[in-house]
Design a protein with these regions (language model features):
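Non-catalytic interaction/Regulatory regions outside core domains
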Residues: 2-139
Length: 139
């Protein structure tokens, strides 16, 4: 049931990104505060190798991804969403690939050019909120 809820949230969020381009994009991210950690990626093209690697890793590590309440906001250069959020995260000039991890508290936890998901999991697992989640898991 929890998986269905998480997946439903992810699908609704993806639909919102494309359907509501006039809504302030910071508001879209605020919807996830306290419920999800958000990986925002900025890529210069859909075929960007770092972007594709991250998407592949999300599928490969889907259980670990869901366990950490992650959602992925995938932004391609030239779109309205990219423009708005790149300003919010102070991206300047041409960006080949940039990944920003936002914690459940709404704060930026990581800004990197790496798309290594296991490294992101390791970082998340050191966060106080995640440590509390681990202690309450029943597996």
């Amino acid at each position: 049931m929890r998986r269905l809820l998480v997946r439903s949230r992810q699908l609704i969020f993806a639909a919102c990104l494309f359907a509501i381009s006039s809504q302030p994009h910071a508001e879209l991210l605020k919807d996830y505060k306290l419920t999800n950690r958000v990986i925002v990626t900025f890529s210069n093209a859909e075929s960007n190798s770092d972007r594709l690697l991250l998407i592949q890793q999300i599928k490969l590590y889907s259980c670990q991804y869901r366990k950490r309440d992650l959602v992925h906001v995938d932004l391609i250069e030239g779109t309205e969403q990219y423009k708005h959020l790149s300003r919010k995260f102070s991206l300047t000039g041409h960006t080949h690939f940039k990944l920003v991890l936002i914690g459940k508290d709404g704060e930026v936890k990581l800004s990197t050019t790496s798309s290594n998901l296991p490294d992101i999991f390791s970082l998340i697992d050191t966060m106080p909120m995640r440590k509390r989640e681990i202690h309450s898991e029943k597996c």
